[in-house]
Amino acid sequence: FSGATAVTQGNSSNVTVSSALSSKSLEIYGGAIALNENITTTGTNADVLIKAISNINLAASKTITTVAGDVNLWADSDDNSNGYVQLLAGAAINSTGGDINLGGGADLMSDYAFGTTTETCPEVVGTQYISGVHMRQGTSLNSNNGNISVRGQNANTSNAAMSFGLSLRGVTMNSGTGKI
């Protein structure tokens, strides 16, 4: 980790995962959280919780993997309508039977991750707001019979930019017998 000395509940410093993590289960709390390396849980039913006050980014071609554990990426946990979840090109979440939940706000299961930042996006012509949940080309969510929930919202304050609650292009979601 870098950027914070603690990653426990209540931490508000930005956190960067800069080396691969392998743990029985894992919880990371922070301001903005950058997942720049692979994360793997080693215990069966061991969950991953990434809870950010603002944004969560899973770097290109990086993976989060569990064995029947839930994966929860929870942005904008202070519920101030400013915090997105972004999976960059080729990133993957594999829960092998656990649920995958991407969202934000006060309650991960009923509120939304919220995009407010603009960027020039290579997948489209022009400028767009980063969506509440933004999954780039080649990303995948594979729950192998767990449920998948993706909840995002956006507030476009400019007529010169596009905005979407969810932005999914060239994305694979496979829940097996689970619900999406």
Which sequence ranges carry the predicted segments?
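Extracellular beta-strand scaffolds
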Residues: 5-7, 12-16, 21-23, 31-35, ...
